[in-house]
C-alpha cells in the first residue's frame, strides 16, 4: 500500500468561472434551452494518473454522487456538468453510471437516465439516487418541470441498475406546487434520497432550505401520506439517510458555501439530534453533495469537489474517502485526501473494517 497523502494538491481553477452562489446558479443554469448550449470538451487529464486517485471520475466533469451496493459491486450514479468554462450556471442534461468491485477501478456504463426519460421535464438533471427493491431499481431525480413552475422530483424504474429506465408515472412524484417554498423560491423540491426501513416502509427525503420527508407506497412511485417538514440546523440541501447499529444518520449540506453535517435519531422519523460537521468546504466548489455506503465491511463517503483542471463551481468532480466511526457511533470528520482509500483509521476509530 502506498503511503497516504492527506490533503489535496490545489489545482488552479479558472478565474472566469464566477462563484455566484446557489441562487444565481439556479437562475442562470435553470433555463429551458440547455440543448442549445455548447457541449463541454473532456477535461485534461492530470499527470500522473494513478488508480484510486481523487477525483475518481476523470474523463468528464461529474457531480452529486449517489452510490448503490448490489451484487458485489458499487454502482455509482453521477450528474454530468457540461457548463462551458465561461459559464455562470449549471448545464446538466443526463446522469452517468459507473461500477466497481474494488473501489479503485471504475467501469463506465454510459447514460442510463437523462432529462428526456421524464416526458414532463424540460431541463436540469440535478441530484439523484437509485435504490433496489424486490429486484427492481428505482431512480429518483431532480429536474425542472416543463409546465409547473420550478423544480420537481421524478422516478424512473428498471430491472437492472444499468437500465433501461422508464418513467411509469409519466408525471412528477413531487412538484413545486405541492409545497410552500420560503419567499416563493422554486428550487426547494430538489435532491431526493430514499431509505427503506427495517419494517419495509420506504421514505423519501428531499429539500433545499426546508428539509422534508414523506412515506412511499409499496409500489415506490407514489407518496403515501402527508409531506412533513423537518427542523435541521443550517440545512441547505443534499439529504442522505443511512443506518448503522440501530442508529439513523441524516447527513446534509450545511450552510453556504456548504459543509456536510449530520444528525442522528433512534427512528427514521426522528427526533433528530444535530451532531456536527463531517466534511469541510471542498476546493473550488461552494456546493457539497455526499453519498454514504457500506461495502465489504468498510464505510465510504462519496462527494464532489472541483479538482480537475478547468474545474469550478459548475464543473465539479466526484471523489471518495473512507469513513470511520468512534466508539460512541459518532462519525469522525472526513479527511479530504489525494488517495482517499489509503487513509488509515484515525485515533479513536472503531467498528467496521480493519
For each feature predicted by the language model, list its residue ranges.
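Sec-dependent signal peptide recognition
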Residues: 14-23
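Carbohydrate-active catalytic/glycan-binding domains of CAZyme proteins
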Residues: 32-354
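C-terminal motif of bacterial Sec signal peptides marking the signal peptidase cleavage site
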Residues: 27-30
Amino acid at each position: 500500500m502506498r503511503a497516504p497523502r492527506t490533503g489535496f494538491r490545489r489545482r488552479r481553477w479558472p478565474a472566469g468561472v464566477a462563484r455566484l452562489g446557489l441562487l444565481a446558479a439556479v437562475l442562470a443554469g435553470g433555463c429551458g434551452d440547455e440543448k442549445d448550449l455548447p457541449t463541454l470538451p473532456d477535461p485534461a487529464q492530470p499527470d500522473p494518473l494513478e488508480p484510486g486517485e481523487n477525483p475518481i471520475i476523470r474523463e468528464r466533469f461529474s457531480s452529486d454522487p449517489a452510490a448503490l451496493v448490489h451484487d458485489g459491486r458499487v454502482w455509482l450514479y453521477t450528474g454530468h456538468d457540461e457548463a462551458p468554462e465561461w459559464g455562470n450556471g449549471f448545464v446538466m442534461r443526463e446522469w452517468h453510471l459507473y461500477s466497481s468491485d474494488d473501489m479503485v477501478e471504475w467501469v463506465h456504463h454510459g447514460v442510463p437516465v437523462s432529462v428526456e426519460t421524464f416526458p414532463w421535464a424540460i431541463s436540469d438533471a440535478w441530484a439523484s439516487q437509485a435504490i433496489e427493491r424486490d429486484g427492481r431499481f428505482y431512480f429518483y431525480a431532480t429536474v425542472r418541470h416543463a409546465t409547473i413552475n420550478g423544480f420537481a422530483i421524478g422516478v424512473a424504474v428498471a430491472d437492472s441498475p444499468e437500465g433501461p429506465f422508464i418513467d411509469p408515472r409519466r408525471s412528477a412524484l413531487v412538484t413545486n406546487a405541492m409545497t410552500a417554498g420560503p419567499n416563493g423560491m422554486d428550487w426547494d423540491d430538489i435532491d431526493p434520497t430514499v431509505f427503506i426501513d427495517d419494517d419495509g416502509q420506504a421514505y423519501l427525503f428531499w429539500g433545499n432550505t426546508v428539509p422534508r420527508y414523506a412515506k412511499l407506497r409499496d409500489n415506490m412511485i407514489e407518496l403515501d401520506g402527508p409531506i412533513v417538514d423537518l427542523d435541521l440546523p443550517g440545512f441547505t440541501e443534499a439529504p442522505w439517510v443511512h443506518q448503522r447499529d440501530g442508529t439513523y444518520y441524516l447527513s446534509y449540506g450545511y450552510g453556504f458555501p456548504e459543509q456536510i453535517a449530520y444528525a442522528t435519531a433512534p427512528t427514521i422519523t426522528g427526533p433528530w439530534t444535530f451532531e456536527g460537521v463531517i466534511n469541510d468546504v471542498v476546493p473550488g466548489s461552494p456546493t457539497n453533495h455526499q453519498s454514504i455506503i457500506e461495502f465489504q465491511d468498510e464505510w465510504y463517503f462519496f462527494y464532489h469537489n472541483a479538482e480537475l483542471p478547468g474545474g469550478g463551481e459548475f464543473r465539479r468532480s466526484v471523489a471518495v474517502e473512507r469513513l470511520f466511526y468512534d466508539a460512541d457511533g459518532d462519525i469522525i470528520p472526513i479527511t479530504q485526501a489525494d488517495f482517499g482509500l489509503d487513509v488509515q483509521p484515525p485515533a479513536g476509530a472503531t467498528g467496521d473494517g480493519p
